[in-house]
Regions:
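Positively charged, helix-rich recognition surfaces that bind polyanionic ligands
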Residues: 233-486
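Short amphipathic alpha-helical segments
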Residues: 17, 21, 133, 137-144, ...
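Stable alpha-helical structural segments in soluble proteins, enriched in small hydrophobic residues
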Residues: 32, 140-152, 453-463
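Short, charged, low-complexity amphipathic alpha-helix
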Residues: 1-16, 305-315
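N-terminal cap/recognition module
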Residues: 4-107
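Short amphipathic alpha-helical coiled-coil/interface segments
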Residues: 25, 65, 141-149, 320-327, ...
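Acidic carboxylate diad motif detector
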Residues: 62-231, 374, 378
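Generic detection of short hydrophobic beta-strand segments and adjacent strand-loop junctions
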Residues: 4-8, 208-215, 279-284, 415
């Protein structure tokens, strides 16, 4: 899949359409959530103990199911009548395959409302939010709510079996507090059209088309869907196409491997087993961007809340929205530049697989100093890994993510053991080398190496999908090349 993003401001002719649909999507999702939660709590109580809202919701649900079942019976009988009047072998076959579909009423033990039940209840009862929304956009909002609940049920079952995987017990899906939620159009309600060498989207019930740019950009792709999400005072239109590309699979016997260590001072550190010098991409632009963002945001919030209670005052402004948009776009730009440099380097050196180090929940309870903590947790490393995966799929280079605990502390040259952090019964490991200053690691024999390159080498070693014996013989990973991307 490939997604194009477009920012839409208040000057756009479709601003009202996007405002209405994102606000209604939020209402629809909250309404579906409200029905599910009240049916859950209401059926667990006796009729005398139920609250007014629980009684009202249960009445709406039972009435809606009754009406939907009655309509289903009428449609079934009408279809049978038409088929019998038509006669013939084909009608007889269709008639034998025709089935009456009816909804079951929720019970104390089986209380969950599926998408089909919610959609039928809102449709036959004429719910105002459901009826005023664009076709299929309302149904997609219900689907997202039901999907959130199913994910919750799955997480609860997994939590019961493996509580150590979670920070806390999963909670039931909550209500959306923002003014809007992501609205989702299918390729039937937001249709793609080409005219005069350009591509346009035509939304249902809207006369004004939305221009996507040159038609040549989308040649050979299959249009899938369009999503519109609130984005710091603007709207971001995400148009998804099927480019028929899948992530490349790891070869059975890879020979050339590239280890990547993601960090802060050095955003990327890469080292391979094929003799080329390792390189590091400086993280200065990312740190400077975050520092500027935090400083400017503090100034704007201070001016906005001056003379009022900071906890309960209004903290939204056009300047804050513009600042957040600028920071997000700049961060995305830096990450994609890093990803493209890394993947072009990999293609140039015929790399068989890229191994990226990561730590699960690495930002939880981190303690690397007050200033480093602030800088580290502000960088969306998950987004950087996703950018690398996206570019790798385009260039068909396999990418593997490897758990990297202790890779920065262990000595690559001394073959130190690197267990998984947090394992039960783990004895704290002792390492042969140590970091003697910022960015420099010294092994047992006194040999010095760039600390981040040592981490990248250990990530390759921990992945253990190819032999690194040649690196120990050659010793050509001492001095990395520094790359500046801004």
């Amino acid at each position: 899949m490939r997604t194009w993003g477009f920012n839409v401001n208040k000057n756009s002719a479709l601003w009202k359409c996007f405002s209405r649909n994102t606000a209604d999507t939020r209402c629809m999702r909250n309404t579906a959530n409200f029905y599910i939660r009240n049916v859950m709590t209401g059926l667990r109580k006796s009729p005398e103990e139920r609250t007014h809202t629980e009684t009202e919701v249960l009445h709406e649900v039972f009435t809606g199911i009754q009406k939907a079942n009655t309509l289903a019976v009428e449609r079934y009988r009408e279809n049978l009548r038409k088929l019998r009047l038509a006669g013939g072998m084909k009608s007889a076959v269709v008639c034998s395959c025709l089935k009456l579909k009816q909804f079951s009423y929720p019970t104390r033990t089986n209380w969950f409302l599926s998408y089909e039940v919610l959609d039928a209840v809102f449709k036959v009862t004429g719910h105002p939010v459901y009826c005023r929304m664009d076709s299929q956009v309302n149904q997609n909002a219900i689907r997202k709510t039901v999907k959130a609940w199913k994910s919750y049920f799955k997480a609860v079952r997994d939590y019961a079996a493996h509580p150590e995987k979670y920070q806390a017990k999963p909670r039931i899906p909550g209500y959306i507090r923002t003014t809007g939620a992501t609205a989702w159009w299918t390729n039937q309600t937001a249709k793609l059209r080409f005219r005069d060498g350009k591509a346009y989207l035509r939304f249902v019930n809207e006369k004004q088309p939305f221009c996507l740019g040159k038609a040549s950009l989308f040649e050979g792709f299959t249009y899938v869907k369009t999503e519109v999400q609130p984005f710091h005072g603007h709207f971001r239109v995400l148009v998804t196409f099927d480019d028929r590309l899948k992530e490349a699979s790891v070869p059975e016997h890879p020979e050339r491997i590239l280890g990547v260590d993601i960090g802060l001072t050095n955003l990327l550190s890469a080292a391979g087993n094929f003799g080329d010098a390792p390189f590091v991409v400086g993280g200065g632009p990312v740190k400077a961007l975050n520092q500027w963002f935090n400083k400017r945001k503090a100034e704007l919030l201070s001016a906005l809340t001056r003379g009022s209670d900071s906890k309960h005052s209004h903290k939204e402004s056009h300047a804050l929205d513009a600042l957040s948009r600028k920071r997000d776009d700049a961060m995305t730009d830096i990450f994609y530049k890093c990803a493209w440099y890394l993947l072009r380097y990999a293609k140039k050196n015929q790399v068989d697989v890229i191994v990226i180090g990561y730590n699960k929940a690495q930002k939880q309870d981190i303690s690397i100093g007050k200033q480093n903590n602030q800088a580290f947790v502000s960088v969306p490393y998950g987004k950087l890994r996703q950018c690398i995966r996206t570019v790798a799929a385009k260039l068909q280079v396999p990418v593997v993510e490897q758990e990297e605990s202790y890779t920065s502390m262990a000595s690559f040259w001394d073959l130190d053991e690197m267990p998984v952090y947090g394992e039960a019964g783990l004895v704290p490991p002792v390492f042969s080398g140590r970091r003697i200053c910022r960015g420099l690691y010294q092994d047992r024999s006194g040999r010095r190496i760039n600390a981040d390159v040592n981490g990248a080498l250990n990530i390759m070693r921990k992945c253990n999908i190819v032999s690194l014996r040649a690196l120990y013989d050659r010793g050509d990973v001492d001095t990395p090349v520094r790359i500046r991307i801004a």
